[in-house]
Amino acid sequence: MEFIMALHMRDQLISALSAPAPGEIEKHKANVEVYLEHPAGIGEHSDITEAIGVELDKISRYHDQLEVINHYFKKR
């Protein structure tokens, strides 16, 4: 019984760690799309390439987190 509870807790923790990443990725992808489609409309960002780079870094962070969780911690 204790083993089953530990497995359930493990699955819950992995799920909790994985859950926010897809939404964050979509949010930052949307920001990049805004920069690409309407660069003149973004007045507070004079360096569009730098702003896009920041968004790409954020996408990479969440993508990498999912890759690590899936590669090292999810059961096969």
Where are the regions that the model predicts?
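Extended, charge-rich alpha-helical interface modules
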Residues: E2-R76
